[in-house]
Amino acid sequence: MDFVAGAIGGVCGVAVGYPLDTVKVRIQTEAKYAGIWHCIRDTYRQERVWGFYRGLSLPVCTVSLVSSVSFGTYHHCLAHICRFRYGSTDAKPTKADITLSGCASGLVRVFLTSPTEVAKVRLQTQTQAQTQQRRSSASWTSGAPALCPTPTACLEPRPKYSGPLHCLVTVAREEGLRGLYKGSSALLLREGHSFATYFLSYAMLCEWLTPAGHSQPDVLGVLVAGGCAGVLAWAVATPMDVIKSRLQADGQGQHRYRGLLHCVVTSVREEGPRVLFKGLALNCCRAFPVNMVVFVAYEAVLRLTQSLLT
């Protein structure tokens, strides 16, 4: 049931946090935004509400699988560690056991999420300005003005990617399989230690918030533990998240970065060390409600099934 509960929790989390995720990605990849509110105002003015939901369909379709694998891997890994070390899956795991299982959960996610992350970032950073710039570049290169079949076509330039699946196909055709796994090195570094932090902090907070005489926390305890675990995980994940987003967005025009280290050095040299923490406040603000919902849904499904089976 860990897989089913994780899938339901993941879908609930995406529904809550996607608009702020779009804002976060744009702040991290586009220097024109002075801050969170500037990005929100500019996105709404140019693209209205739909601009905050660009690329949503693919995460919704895949998040159930990814979240299911994350929670399932964590609990199965933890069970195997406890059986190997203590002879029983019911033994209380140590903090090191939880950390190792959480890290394994994060690393497994990368193979599933990298292509969808590339599509999500490309669609989220595909603005009207970029579309217009690409049209102008094509006109300049050809030496002739772009011909518009209709006045509407000139006013509304066609975006490069028409949707998540089209984006994946286009990236694979233009950049090969490596294009779909662009930024996966940064994603590995982000997911490994952030999910170790995520599950360890949740387990510790649940233990602290469990009332005396009870075996598990109440709903309020789960809400607080889940929200705080999400904030702590994103606090340690943000530097690599910035690099990951820049590497994955680096395919909509000139290729600026040769790899992970070059992206880190170039970003810090041009924008200072603070660039690695772009979107940190937004990540933390988004993480609290999203992970409250994820863990409440997850725990609710587990407790419901346990009550039905006993």
Swiss-Prot record:
Q: Which domain of life is it from?
A: Eukaryota
Tell where it localizes: Mitochondrion inner membrane; Mitochondrion outer membrane
Q: Which UniProt keywords apply?
A: Membrane, Mitochondrion, Mitochondrion inner membrane, Mitochondrion outer membrane, Repeat, Transmembrane, Transmembrane helix, Transport
Which InterPro entries does the annotation name? Mit_carrier, Mitochondrial_Carrier, Mitochondrial_sb/sol_carrier, Mt_carrier_dom_sf
Identify its membrane topology class.
Multi-pass membrane protein
Please verify whether the record's keywords include Transport: yes
The tissues in which it is expressed are: Specifically expressed in liver (at protein level).
Q: What follows loss of this gene?
A: Mutant mice show increased hepatic steatosis upon methionine- and choline-deficient or high-fat diet associated with increased hepatic lipid droplets and triglycerides and cholesterol levels. They spontaneously develop hepatocellular carcinomas.
Q: Which GO terms describe its cellular component?
A: mitochondrial inner membrane; mitochondrial outer membrane; mitochondrion
Q: Which reaction does it catalyse?
A: NAD(+)(in) = NAD(+)(out); acetyl-CoA(in) = acetyl-CoA(out)
Solcar repeat ranges? Answer: 1-80, 93-208, 217-304
Q: What is its main location?
A: mitochondrion
Which Pfam families does the UniProt entry name for this protein? Answer: Mito_carr
TM regions (residue ranges): 3-23, 55-75, 98-114, 194-210, 219-239, 280-298
Q: Which GO terms describe its molecular function?
A: acetyl-CoA transmembrane transporter activity; NAD transmembrane transporter activity
Quote the record's miscellaneous comment.
SLC25A47 is transcriptionally up-regulated in response to antihyperglycemic drug metformin. Promotes metformin pharmacological effects.
Q: Which family does it belong to?
A: Belongs to the mitochondrial carrier (TC 2.A.29) family.
Described purpose of this protein according to its UniProt entry? Mitochondrial NAD(+) transporter that acts as a 'metabolic gate' in hepatic lipogenesis. Provides NAD(+) substrate to mitochondrial SIRT3 deacetylase and enables its NAD(+)-dependent activities in mitochondrial energy metabolism. This triggers downstream activation of PRKAA1/AMPK-alpha signaling cascade that negatively regulates sterol regulatory element-binding protein (SREBP) transcriptional activities and ATP-consuming lipogenesis to restore cellular energy balance. May transport other mitochondrial metabolites having an aromatic nucleotide and phosphate groups, such as acetyl-CoA.
Official protein name in the record: Solute carrier family 25 member 47
Could you tell me which species this protein originates from? Mus musculus (Mouse)
